[in-house]
Amino acid sequence: MGHKHERPVEPFSDLHVEHGHVRATLLHDPTVEGLDMAIYMDGSASMSGDYAYKKKYNNLIDWFFGRNEVNLPNNVEPQVQWILEYLATKDRNGLLRVAYWACGASGKDIELVGELKGTDVQSYKFPGPNFQGKSTNLAPALKDYVNYLRKQMHLGARRGCAVFVTDGEIHDEDDVKRYCNEIAKEMQKGSLPKINFILVGVGEGVNEEQMEEICHEEYPGIGHLWCHRIAEEINEVAELVAVLVDESMTVAGGGRIVDDKGKVLKLYESRLPAVLEFQIPEGA
């Protein structure tokens, strides 16, 4: 049995199976002290249709004369609005850095929207960047966030997490992995706090396979830095931040894990941690 990322169902928010070893994260709404969060929206040309506002008319006559039109939200806006509203409750000061990435002719530019609150999110509009990128480069966005986090560390940030909204078409996967190796080394040295990244797929035709390639990478001494979600498939908001949940968090006083034949695979007597790790026998 190789590495497999299963579709989690309640009560799980994340599930990994590799050679019979299961790592399951229970659905848990974590509180992380000193957490500084950000949202980056894909600004590349492949996302142009997802930023387009569609018009709605009451009838054919209104459509013909172009009157009484109603602008509907684009594919990105409602997703970013609820993500922002939720993540602001996790952020240390309730302000999130929001920006477009993969902008400009090189696909490496960042267009900063600003630091936004999680209140009145329906008033925020996200029509896309001023200059769409001709390629989709994620590494510059990671560097932008890390540089931002370094400054926030002097103001009280003790942990970082950035969400990258995308259609999954990423052109610099090798650069992303190389830079993540640098981040992992700095985390081990203590020059950077613990950081996690979340890819959120939006729109039609999300390239989930490439998102999985990035998220399955493990870094020495750190493990996984990434997780990914498909926005339309998120049923519980806490699923979004499963990557922030760790073994130190407790969800119950105890419990046990049994297979389909009733055999006890693992027993937790004093506390049930939010992250469960156990072996599952072949055929179970």
Predicted segments — roles?
Residues 1-69, 150:
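Acidic, polar low-complexity linker/tail segments
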Residues 27-31, 86-90, 147-158, 185-191:
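Surface-exposed acidic, glycine-flexible loop patches that form ligand/cofactor-binding
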Residues 68-80, 130-143, 172-176:
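Phosphate/oxyanion-binding active-site loops and adjacent basic polyanion-contact surfaces
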Residues 92-127, 209-214:
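Short beta-strand-loop
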Residues 208-210, 216-264:
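C-terminal helix of von Willebrand factor
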